[in-house]
Amino acid sequence: MKKAAKLVAASVITTLALGSLSAPVAALEAITDTLSVDFSQTTGSFRGGATGTLYGFGDEGAPTQALINGAAITNTSQKAPHGTQHPSGDALKVEDGFFQKHGKDMYIYIQDYYPDWSYHGGVRPADTRTYNQATGAYSNEPNGIWDYLEVVEFVTEAVATGSSRPKDYVFIPFNEPDGGNWYANWSTMKATFLADWKAIYTKIQEVYARHNLGHARIGGPGDTRWQPARSADILTFAKANGVLPDIFIWHELGIDNLRTFRSHFAEYRQLEKDLGLGPIPINITEYGMLRDMGTPGQLVQWLSIMEDLKVDGQTAYWNYAGNFNDNSARTNSANAGWWMYKWYGDLAGSQTVKVTPPALNTVDTLQGIGAIDTKNRRATVLYGGGSGGAVSLKLAGLSSFGTKVDIEVRENTLSGAEGVAGTPPVIKALKGVRVVNGTVELEVPTYDRYAGYQVIVTPEQDRTLEAGKVWAASVEAENTNLTAATVYTQDPLSGGGWKFLASGGRDVGSFNQPTSKADWTVSVPRDGKYRFQIIGATPGTPGRHALFVDNVMASPVQYTANLALTSYQKWQYRGSAEVTIPLTAGQHTLSLRASADGTTLLPNSDITLDKFLLTDVTDGEPTVYPASTLRYAGGAAVTYGVAQARGHGSIRGAGQRADVYAQAWETGYYDISVDYRTTAAAKVGIRVNGRAVTQLSAPRLGVWRSTARVHLVQGINELELSSANGILLQQVTTTRAASADSAAVVVEAENAVRHGTAVVNTYTPASGSNASGLKGAGYIGNGAGNTIEVPRGPGFDKPGEYNVVVSYANAELSGAHDYNPQVVDRRLNITETGSTTPAGHAYFRYTYAWNSFLERTIPVTLHTSTGSLVFGNPTAFAPDLDKLTIAPTTLGTPTTIPRTRIPQS
């Protein structure tokens, strides 16, 4: 292979690093791994089913629709309708959000109808009850029918009559029957299990038949692990009796399963052949350990195996429902795991290709997925894991892209389970790289083995590529100058996988003395505003630190509470805190301290520290989403056939659409700028988070930039672009316009008019609470009269569409479980006096403590000019409220200016 193709030697290459962003010491000392990808050797259609979840959905809107659609989750297992195993996760309540765009298969755990784990005390029910099939109520009297068969009928009937997509359900009669759930002793329970399987299979089909729904899909057996002998017995019986599962299910839980998974799959497929069965689809409905969740370099190892084998899989449910099993953050934000899900979902419509890693069937190694999208002419590699050193990529089979290609490499580093990860930055931008015999080689430095990487290769585009567009730097907390603190090694193999991983493999703890501090000396390029982000874990309470710059107090740092109900959550379930500070160009020492005065500890300041990040936000942190990276629907696609528009997205006509998943660090106003070309006058419609908010326009043929000022919510925002007349889209850019936030109206909840039981809550300074003014409102709801009321005033005194940003707390738990926090998502309704149409509502997820507040945005449509906004819930308690921010969805009139040159990305 000619070395001229190596990117490190080619003169046409632009490689721009992100400021002083540096890898951990361990990563710098590691060896280089090689990953080979041949895009000419396809291995099948991209399946996309490896990012399924177990109880990843909590309630309607928890997670939000933007998170759901962006993650492109195709399958999930949820609670049986009316089940009592967990307070949330009912399949019927979450199906609309799941099926909206990418959802295909809704699985339900029928046994989760029972409240206890193991189910029914771990003992198979007998006939001691009589169930009312209309209501699910039962009396403690036998009726000649096996009790569980009555439960199966009731659950199946609920799906058949209550779901809008009953044919897309998969019923799982048994969950881990080889464990503590009724059939563990195969020598004594085999005959019973087989008879029960047949009876349940038959009953489910009977229910669907009476509703003319055709064949109901059934999955099983659902064992705790691959069980070859049990599986052989079950399949032999099922074949003979005409009750074969439609989906074959088992679990892969543990560290070593990364080594053994492929062999289990091979044994199963051989068993099918031995029994004369055609291949049955497989779903590993529980896989992975805590150490894998939210960690791109771990997740990609699982995803690569499943995509290679073309099986579906669902991450295990180790904590609480509604956050994709620790693969999203806060109420609407991405962590690093979510971005890996999103990247994986971006491969839809592609063909996967041959990938050769350093080793297969080995725990914690460099692994990857390669795919080629021939319609959009995009070749992608996703990879992570390995030694933590640089990765040498050998990319072959690119001849169809021509003699030159563009390459962008994006980096996605570990941010903690609850820590916010921004849009992954471009760390290498490589323009016009010469392709030699269809091959290109490049070397990419690796932050650490837990990071994930996306490499996108396209034919040469008509845009300027740029890495490090926004200056940023980071440092591992353990690599700062520490005083009165301890560095702890977080071994990824310890505890059997029951631990969350730390960036760089270490973190800082025992940060509990008045003299405790972590000093980071860093140079910034210019005078301006900078966001300082700390990734760390609070022990179940909100807390505070003080940030000093050059030994002068610059800002308090406020942390929200993190999950800390168990030993493997406390100090390890890491979130993030962000503050914005002014800095002058040059070197500064940023000092994070447990005390503001050196003698008195700040409230709950004993917080573990993992990583610090510093980002230049002076210019609003413009974030570019190029057309070559977007998702397209309805026939829209990237085109390379138009001069001066190579790599642009062609969007024309009804149904055609480009989807952008734009990240916002804070709720507020942003300028959404669209760069595009037109052949005549054209309009561009923009929907934000499911709502049409604005329309851009170009007057004639030309090259244009149109900009609209739109209120975005903290976290992920789904932008959908369409054009009836047709445009060639180059890119979408979001830029923070913080000065416009003055258009929003802020109302402290304690200052609203209270009705019924609603009271003012007061939080002591010692609590560490992040409540604004240390006050809020509580005991709202659980009765129609228990509300707070906000009279209309300037800023929201006209009918129209608004966002209501709710700062809230919800720490309600219901019942107990061996390891799952039994969280309750609380609902808040907004009504408008004088209008019969509800203004809006949302469910509010768990915040870990009653004095720790997150924010959730409710889109509302107001129909009057004077009607007060009333907040409550007539049937259950609403969350406690801190403050309410009411903002028009857009400001001003969109602008369009001609462009005489191609704007830089």
Regions found by a protein language model. Name each.
Residues 246, 250-295:
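Glycoside hydrolase catalytic-domain groove-lining segments
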Residues 385-482, 553, 836, 844-846:
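C-terminal beta-sandwich/jelly-roll accessory domains of carbohydrate-active enzymes
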Residues 71-245, 249-255:
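Substrate-binding cleft and catalytic face of glycoside hydrolase catalytic domains
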